[in-house]
Amino acid sequence: HANELDLFVEQALAKIANSGAMLLNQAVLLRGVNDSIGSLKDLSQRLLHCRVLPYYLHQLDPVNGAAHFEVEVKKGLQLIAELRSCLPGYAVPRYVQELRGEPNKTVLA
């Protein structure tokens, strides 16, 4: 969430970026936390300000006790489409899901 990128985190990320490392973010789409266009747009913009590329947005893995955070894939796809309409391509993360038995993440959008 963009609110997690405070001054302390920004300074730490700057030190890493200044060393020449490429910084990539992986976030999980969570109901009630970051499942709005405003939240995701703010996160992407804040990450870029900190020189971090918004790389992956994960569909939540089905785990016990977390069903209340699950966002439907249809809504996730809609959010990515909305991000594409208001941000440059490099600021839109790949929407992915890990599927049982698959060796790699499955790109949803």
Named regions from a protein language model:
Residues 1-75, 79-86:
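Conserved AdoMet/S-adenosylmethionine-binding subsite of the radical SAM
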Residues 77-109:
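C-terminal accessory regions of radical SAM enzymes
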